[in-house]
């Protein structure tokens, strides 16, 4: 893959063979951002897990202390009373059968879907289109709930979902390049601490094999786990 001039210049700003402290890595990620827009900063964890085993297929949600800097569009599938609560909390759209039909016809101008438990059976028919897009509500991530207003508020305030991919990696946004370095660092630590908390008991050996930070289109910066809190 041919890299642009800006990317190649950015790579010269750090040593690829070195794993940096958490804060150093954040500052280098900001410095090496090559995008012309306010790029997203992402952390990637390579975990020693086998996602084919139920207890090692990690999935959940976490509220980042400083949000992600992204405006999140939330839709809520619920009956009229709950739909009203969701709209008051800032949902883009909320409804039941009509909204399900609209989505079934190909409308996907939203980022997260929340649903009340009583609507999940009707939503099931959209599983084939929602599943591959990662939009199907799930109790593990707090997107199947009766408290739709709280769910909408938390998601819009910076609650993110995480899950292991096919090879056991977890990728998560921690904010924008324009964020203060300390805030990005604290967001990264929130995700790290969560992953440590949910380490499966069946994992043998090193749990977190590699940690890297990068920005949209920018190079990856290695983070030393023992110094991630520094």
UniProtKB/Swiss-Prot annotation:
Q: Which cysteines are joined by disulfide bonds?
A: none
Which superkingdom does the taxonomy of this entry point to?
A: Bacteria
Keywords linked to the UniProt accession: Repressor, Ribonucleoprotein, Ribosomal protein, RNA-binding, rRNA-binding, Translation regulation, tRNA-binding
Keyword Ribosomal protein among UniProt keywords: yes
Quaternary assembly: Part of the 50S ribosomal subunit.
A GO BP entry: translation
The lineage, from the top, is: Bacteria, Bacillati, Mycoplasmatota, Mollicutes, Acholeplasmatales
Q: Which gene encodes it?
A: rplA
The species this protein was found in = Acholeplasma laidlawii (strain PG-8A)
Name of the molecule in the record:
Large ribosomal subunit protein uL1
InterPro entries linked to this entry: Ribosom_uL1_bac-type, Ribosomal_uL1, Ribosomal_uL1-like, Ribosomal_uL1/biogenesis, Ribosomal_uL1_3-a/b-sand, Ribosomal_uL1_CS
The record's function comment reads: Binds directly to 23S rRNA. The L1 stalk is quite mobile in the ribosome, and is involved in E site tRNA release.
Q: Which Pfam families match?
A: Ribosomal_L1 (PF00687)
Instruction: Give the family per the record.
Output: Belongs to the universal ribosomal protein uL1 family.
Record GO terms (molecular function) = rRNA binding; structural constituent of ribosome; tRNA binding
């Amino acid at each position: 893959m041919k890299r642009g001039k800006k990317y190649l210049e950015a790579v010269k700003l750090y040593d690829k063979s070195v794993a940096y402290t958490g804060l150093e890595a954040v500052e280098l990620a900001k410095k090496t951002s090559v995008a012309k827009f306010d790029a997203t900063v992402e952390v990637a964890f390579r975990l020693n897990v086998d996602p084919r085993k139920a207890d090692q297929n990690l999935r959940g949600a976490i509220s980042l202390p400083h949000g992600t800097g992204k405006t999140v569009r939330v839709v809520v599938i619920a009956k009229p009373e709950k739909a009203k609560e969701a709209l008051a909390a800032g949902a883009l759209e909320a409804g039941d059968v009509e909204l399900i039909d609209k989505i079934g016809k190909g409308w996907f101008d939203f980022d997260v879907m929340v649903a009340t438990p009583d609507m999940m059976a009707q939503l099931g028919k959209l599983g084939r289109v929602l599943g591959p897009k990662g939009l199907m509500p799930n109790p593990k991530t707090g997107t199947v709930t009766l408290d739709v207003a709280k769910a909408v508020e938390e998601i819009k305030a910076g609650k993110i979902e995480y899950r292991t991919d096919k090879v056991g990696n977890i990728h998560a946004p921690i904010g924008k390049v324009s964020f203060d370095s300390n805030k990005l660092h604290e967001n990264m630590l929130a995700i790290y601490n969560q992953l440590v908390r949910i380490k499966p008991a069946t994992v043998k050996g090193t749990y977190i094999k590699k940690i890297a930070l990068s920005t949209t289109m920018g190079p990856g910066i290695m983070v030393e786990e023992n110094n991630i809190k520094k």
